[in-house]
Amino acid sequence: MALLQISEPGQSPDPHQRRVAIGIDLGTTHSLVAAVRNGVAECLPDAQGRVLLPSVVRYLGGGGRQIGYEAAAAQMQDPANTVSSVKRFMGRGLGDITGREKLPYNFIAATDSGGMLSLSTAAGVKSPVEVSAEILATLRYRAEDSFDSDLYGAVITVPAYFDDAQRQATKDAAHLAGLNLLRLINEPTAAAIAYGLDNGAEGVYAVYDLGGGTFDISVLRLAQGVFEVIATGGDSALGGDDYDAALAEWVMQQTGVRASTPEDKTAVRLAARACKEALTATDNVAFTADVAGATVQFDVKREDFAAVTADLTQRSLAAVRRTLRDAQIERDEVKGVVLVGGSTRMPVVRTAVAEFFGREPLTNLNPDEVVAIGAAIQANQLAGNDAAGDLLLLDVIPLSLGIETMGGLVERIIGRNETIPTAKAQDFTTYKDGQTALAIHVVQGERDLVQDCRSLARFELRGIPPMAAGAARIRVTFTVDADGLLSVAAREQASGVEARIDVKPSYGLTDEQIARMLQEGFATAQQDMQTRALVEARVDADRLLIATQSALDVDGDVLTAAERTAIDDLMHALRATLETSTDAAAVEAAAQALAKGTEAFAAQRMNRGIRQALAGKNVSAL
């Protein structure tokens, strides 16, 4: 009798059959697809041998569309229907798009409050998810043609600073493109995979990732196949596009020319990008653009470009400083700096990074391709093709997650820079006697007060059995999956009643909000501690007043008139302190006075309870 065979978990049942899995770098300016072929990760070219796909989609009347190079070539004559840098709009509301008046698109605000924006095109209204799906589908077809096979799945990279809404929008785009999404991974992590495996690197590394629309800085520890992200930071609205815009605005100021039409704005922006790219190889370039029916020409020196964009470069270095502080790493402990993203080709950026870290950055892998290559390596392993692979990814979440407690305080469940995937639980209880429902308010941020953090979601746990205040035990569990998406569950331990929610906020944080939340978290730490102490003292005092009044209502008759008056006076004093004082110590002192003043009353209540329990019983019965 033949023995039945059982395959290893996660591996292909047929040892000779390889699943085709791809890695996709869905970029702001360009996108790429890569795969492992014959043991080597490589970017897949199109029929013309080009590995880069411009992240541009042009919509035509009658439902037609152009994607990639053909669409990019049409930006000048049809800017309103040619969508580029759509990554900046993923998971965003209309109010989040800074400088949208300079863009040639007809934006449409969401019908629901805080929803994701859309764009009006010749082919109808299109969401950023739909536009991104067109790009992903094009890369999918390229990979299928390259392997002449269906795909098992894909790993797609996202900026480390993408929040829940932006990550969910990316997942939706992958689904719309017909891709089986194996994992979302952070772009710096993908770059570290490529460098770690190709070069056998170990130690602490910084990944400086400046793309077309986003900037990420990650500090990683690489050791024996384990890639641990110690800390992440960045700016979700800083990239090569901003360097283009700064140069274009400066040239317009110098020449006195105004770009007012969508066509003129697009012409100036494309000319600025061409000028920026040319300055990578030469010290002096002529800026040339047709604006308002005339040709604008202006000589731009490399030092001019450096001066005009100095604020942008310093913004990136400020994020680097914050992230190193989070990681508790000094600059001289960083063994190497990996440059990722086409924008790191700019000499002004390379020079600034080298001066900051005191060492030349690593550039031996193509900065345009390194993220896609790392994603392909991870996809190959998730598909079960690399049985010997022992790669372990330890990504982190960028901002703390918690819930609101009494007094508007934030109780953190998962701290920022916590390794994901992760699940953490904490027990809470009710505030009032007979409370049968609990409102769960999920927030994100580094401050101690709910009003200073960002609201993510609200839900209710109902059906809690009526109990005395503090008797119920409600376990709240936060789960963050490998893609960085959050789900929250609340369960009352005695009855088993449970409620849960997948947190999918309608749109994401702006770059200003991200920077403010982190900076204020550091700048106001002492103030937050004092405020938290006051709020906690107030909550405890309120709870003591409620409990004391409840006890008086039930057993107040055991007190003499003088004893009752003394307790009433102490309660009045505590209420007066709560109304007038902002000193936590004063509130605590008044509460302690009431607690001490009711000790005899508590003993009398206990004696009464014992007498009632023993009434009518003899010693033998006991």
Swiss-Prot record:
Molecular function GO labels: ATP binding; ATP hydrolysis activity; ATP-dependent protein folding chaperone; unfolded protein binding
Keyword hit for Chaperone: yes
One Pfam family in the UniProt entry: HSP70
One BP term from GO: iron-sulfur cluster assembly
Keywords recorded for this protein, A-Z: ATP-binding, Chaperone, Nucleotide-binding
Similarity-based family: Belongs to the heat shock protein 70 family.
Function description: Chaperone involved in the maturation of iron-sulfur cluster-containing proteins. Has a low intrinsic ATPase activity which is markedly stimulated by HscB.
NCBIfam families noted in UniProt: HscA, PRK05183.1
Protein name, per record: Chaperone protein HscA homolog
Originating organism: Acidovorax sp. (strain JS42)
Name of encoding gene: hscA
